[in-house]
């Protein structure tokens, strides 16, 4: 650690652009404000010193954590101050969650709908109520305390960010000590983090949820600290607590099976995963990561060395294998970030799919709006992270890649046969696009000609997803075969099991897959492959291409390769990120359409006392979604028309947002299709008029560059 490396100066920070010689001189044209935003956090452009860059990134992480904690604190505060949480807790099947009441200004109070129990407010779909119930929060006071705790923690984070940059800044060697970092992150963050959460679940969540499920009034349930301090209270609910740690040390672990279970399926009272299953899961995860956190060699001569592992990693056809990658990952934070974003993005999308198929919190499964919101949220976040991975991989290629140290290793070999990779990927995209779209067009044509017997459908020419059905079947039959102690499969969606209904609403049931899913699946494959094609091309051609051999010298983002080189605009790595983002939006839109229609058609709905299920859209997915016309008529129009007709009701905000979102979308296209010269000419005639009237601005207006225009377009 280096002491007092940089003094704290508010005067310096107050000056816009203090991090750059050019920008700190102040504005000449309006481009200055764009560059200010573009470069403020581009630490590479402030200095070449890797240690200084590392310290800035490290310090910024604390700031990021502070922002997250302040946001979370706000969520908990709203739950404490403005919500009907206690009412919802006492009757979660009839009362809807609300944590915002609109003030009566210019008639906006129309937005406050009746959410049940005499409470009028906006219904929320964030899933916080369900999460709070699962973690054992029973009163608004507890939410207040947590909110205050969050703010205190945020303050600590802000202090830590300042302290570790201005007072005690780590040296470069500390940032590059990967084995120590792996040990501490795996054992500390993931291992002890999971263990402490498992502990909280056992001692607080389990007993409180057990009593809530049994219908005990939340106000009569003992407070969390009483369960922790008084073991007899827990022993009344879970008898093995009376035995203490004896079964643990005598290896009779099965004694604890009253609160560490392996049941599978859902709790029929709440429609959520069995809390005893999730405790068991977190305990197991903790053990795994605590072991993993002792695997890497630091002060003693045992354990893995990452450099040795990477350099030993050679295949028969891969030349030098992973030699040289260790140096890349310890000197290029962009390369490190690219890998982490790709993995975290993929994981986030996996989470999106588990939130509905294995709903982790009580009553989450019957709150359809929240289910849809959580799925959409996690899909979008995952998409952004994956595009970010490609962006930072390209920045690594332009700024940090040194071809002289990477000879005949895997990265070098991938770069050398990039033409084969990209052209094959291109062929795959063409194949998927024409075939998947062709299946729909065929169906539309046959439908229009009145020949249903010649359509691809479950009732005519079947294209059943046999592999997906085989996987479903394997999982559905697992409990009796591979997991004999489990009473149900991991997810009810696999099949076999009965449906779970809570409060006359379907929580979950086996999801049938048919021709319609097979068709839309190939649209997913198509859009994902196009996204990958664009992003990967951006990375592999970031340094050079046949068109522009010296691309690396032009940087990560540039509009064109100078005058006289026609057709070289929009070829920078940045432009590939832009186009990739565009296709990521395309891909995720189809995913969200598929999810919301499939769930409304085949899963969500009400159940009568006789056990008859009525789905929201009456099971029309299998026959309607096999034509383009069906998607337009029975999904997009059928659902959008309800939103558009919401004016004058408490849902009117959504109608206005719907309209506004399309306006913003159209606005973005204006920037994307704009001709820069056209705007520059327009601006200059307007400036001339200002000059005539002696009201000309001191800062000369300038049309957006291509890169800036695309930035505005993509943001909208």
UniProtKB/Swiss-Prot annotation:
It comes from the Eukaryota. It is found in: Plastid, Chloroplast thylakoid membrane. The chain crosses the membrane at residues 57-80, 143-166, 182-206, 278-296, 333-356, 372-398, 420-442, 518-536, 576-597, 651-673, 711-716. The PsaA/B heterodimer binds the P700 chlorophyll special pair and subsequent electron acceptors. PSI consists of a core antenna complex that captures photons, and an electron transfer chain that converts photonic excitation into a charge separation. The eukaryotic PSI reaction center is composed of at least 11 subunits. It is an enzyme of class 1 (oxidoreductase). PsaA and PsaB bind P700, the primary electron donor of photosystem I (PSI), as well as the electron acceptors A0, A1 and FX. PSI is a plastocyanin-ferredoxin oxidoreductase, converting photonic excitation into a charge separation, which transfers an electron from the donor P700 chlorophyll pair to the spectroscopically characterized acceptors A0, A1, FX, FA and FB in turn. Oxidized P700 is reduced on the lumenal side of the thylakoid membrane by plastocyanin. Phylloquinone binds at residue 679. This is Photosystem I P700 chlorophyll a apoprotein A1. It catalyses: reduced [plastocyanin] + hnu + oxidized [2Fe-2S]-[ferredoxin] = oxidized [plastocyanin] + reduced [2Fe-2S]-[ferredoxin]. GO terms for molecular function: 4 iron, 4 sulfur cluster binding; chlorophyll binding; metal ion binding; oxidoreductase activity.
